[in-house]
Amino acid sequence: MATKPQDANTTSREAITSKADSPPRPTALIFDSGVGGLSVYQEIRQLLPDLHYIYAFDNVAFPYGEKSGEFIVERVLEIVTAVQQRHPLAIVVIACNTASTVSLPALRERFAFPVVGVVPAIKPAVRLTRNGVVGLLATRATVHASYTLDLIARFATDCKIELLGSSELVEVAETKLHGGVVPLEVLKKILHPWLSMREPPDTIVLGCTHFPLLTEELAQVLPEGTRMVDSGAAIARRTAWLISSQENVISSQDENIAYCMALDEDTDALLPVLQSYGFPKLQKLPI
């Protein structure tokens, strides 16, 4: 088996909870096209458990992996603006590799608060590989992004980088979080280009925030000893540093909240999952 990673008016669905008294704390927005960003949120919450967290996901335009860069930039700006109009944001984390590779410059130009993005953990993977073959598992948009190719050119000149783009795997991760079973045969089919290699990658970069949610299943399919790395812990450390560096941050006593772009049967089913992550309320975000 492979080893696991190392390092306004709104309609709402609410849990019946009582507000516990809590000290004021800065507000952090975690955004993803789907629920994969919860893997990044987990890492951040471990370091910063007392922040006021908002999780927003774009279940109308999901998945972003097949969308144009122009569409993604406009969409992310629209959503972050809508949240910012309702909450005093101290920091925004774009917990989506695809969105990060295209939208960060526009976000940083528009907003005064820091914006953190997620990029493939190619540099640490290069340090870990033993056979000199590193696999990048991401959406097709991330695999072909100029930012990704630049990372490879800067940090992986002495390694062979095998690229594998899959939007299907994103759907599989979403299915798992909704309570579905992950068929290993589906994973084997997706990973076949690597599994059929004479010398497959011994280190895999999980280049989509959805994929750490599947590490248990991926470990059953990948060759024994394969390492998987993602950038979640590094993003958490960066977020903690940026929060600690701010002065006169507006704090909130509100409870954590999740926003989606449309309420439907799928979001109804997702509410218990969000509650387990510490988000008692799920509301539609008017944009």
From Swiss-Prot:
Record carries keyword Cell wall biogenesis/degradation: yes
Position of the signal peptide: none
BP-aspect Gene Ontology terms: cell wall organization; peptidoglycan biosynthetic process; regulation of cell shape
Region (Disordered) location: 1-25
Top EC group: isomerase
Active site feature: 96, 208
Ranges of Polar residues composition bias in the record: 1-15
Matching PROSITE patterns: ASP_GLU_RACEMASE_1 (PS00923), ASP_GLU_RACEMASE_2 (PS00924)
Reactions performed catalytically: L-glutamate = D-glutamate
GO molecular function: glutamate racemase activity
Keyword Isomerase set for record: yes
Residues binding substrate: 32-33, 64-65, 97-98, 209-210
Entry EC number(s): 5.1.1.3
Pathway membership, UniProt: Cell wall biogenesis; peptidoglycan biosynthesis
Keyword set, alphabetical order: Cell shape, Cell wall biogenesis/degradation, Isomerase, Peptidoglycan synthesis
Pfam families in the cross-refs: Asp_Glu_race
Family matches, as PANTHER family: GLUTAMATE RACEMASE
Biological function: Provides the (R)-glutamate required for cell wall biosynthesis.
Assigned protein family: Belongs to the aspartate/glutamate racemases family.
The protein, known as: Glutamate racemase
